[in-house]
A protein has these predicted regions:
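Membrane-proximal helix-loop-helix interfaces that form the catalytic/acceptor-binding platform
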Residues: 1-282
């Protein structure tokens, strides 16, 4: 895929998948469907670990019915795989934080992050959500930041990811330069992010007509209120909120210079959206 703008993992998997099954449309879409089902199962485990079984049942139910995940779980592209890896990365990270002396989980986390980067570069944008989670768990202060950077397990995960992704780094840089030379993606507007959130909910951006620019702030305000009301769950609430919104905000900002924002690029944020809705309602 060096002549494409996407990383290679999905294409490698598809090559193997076709050799085992066939190259029919149903077969190719079957892989994405499998990823979608596994995403819902892993989201259940993640929400159960972060909150409760009730929230997990509700959140995974919403995800199973979520039109955005359904749409891209039926398409022969890498977005369903990206969503699966985003949930897998986050779940493994939570377990690694809980078992901080278990190097296996930190190494596995580093491997999953690498697989995520080999699937969709923008998956790196959920890593700040992981950082905020461990920062809050360690006290949410300057000492916590120092402790994070002193943690050998954190460096184990980072080193694993760096070494495994290093061979592809020159290709990624080359792909980035080609995109900067001009591409077909439309320009962003002030309604771009609200429209994406609306698509998560109904796969129709018309809800923006009712909520407009207020949709992202509403999510942040509710998250803030719930985090203050339930300190036990503040890290869990913020990891979902940042996972949902920060990638969109970063890519939106980058798109002021040259457009790189498309709704489907954030399929991996959809599980966080459905999880948050479950938390807000539950």
């Amino acid at each position: 895929t060096t002549t494409d703008v996407h990383p290679p993992l999905y294409y490698v998997i598809m090559h193997v998948w076709q050799s085992i099954f066939d190259n029919s449309v149903a077969s190719l879409r079957g892989f994405s469907v499998t990823c979608g089902v596994l995403t819902i199962a892993l989201l259940f485990l993640l929400l159960q670990k972060l909150f409760s079984k009730r929230i997990a049942v509700f959140g995974s139910f919403l995800a199973a019915l979520g039109p955005f995940l359904i749409r891209y779980s039926d398409e022969a592209r890498m977005y369903a795989l990206a969503a699966l890896l985003a949930v897998a990365m986050t779940y493994t990270f939570i377990v690694a934080v809980e078992h901080k002396n278990k190097k296996f989980w930190w190494a596995l986390y580093g491997i999953l992050v690498t697989l995520g980067l080999y699937t969709q570069y923008f998956l790196a944008l959920i890593l700040p959500a992981h950082f905020v989670y461990i920062w809050l768990k360690l006290g949410g202060n300057r000492t916590a930041i120092k402790n994070i950077f002193k943690d050998k397990n954190v460096w184990l995960a980072a080193g694993t990811c760096f070494l495994l992704f290093l061979p592809w780094l020159p290709v990624m840089i080359s792909q980035t330069s080609r995109v900067s030379g001009g591409f077909w993606i439309p320009e962003v507007t002030k309604f771009t992010i609200p429209a994406t959130l609306s698509m998560f909910l109904t796969y129709d951006d018309r809800i923006v007509r009712y909520f407009g620019l207020l949709l992202p702030p509403i999510i942040v305000v509710i998250s803030f209120i719930l985090a203050k009301k339930h300190p036990k769950y503040q890290a869990a609430i913020w990891i979902l909120t940042i996972w949902l919104l920060l990638p969109m905000i970063i890519v939106y900002t980058l798109s002021q210079g040259r457009p790189v924002y498309l709704d489907r690029y954030f399929t991996y944020s959809a599980p966080a959206f459905y999880g948050l809705i479950a938390v807000f309602i539950g």
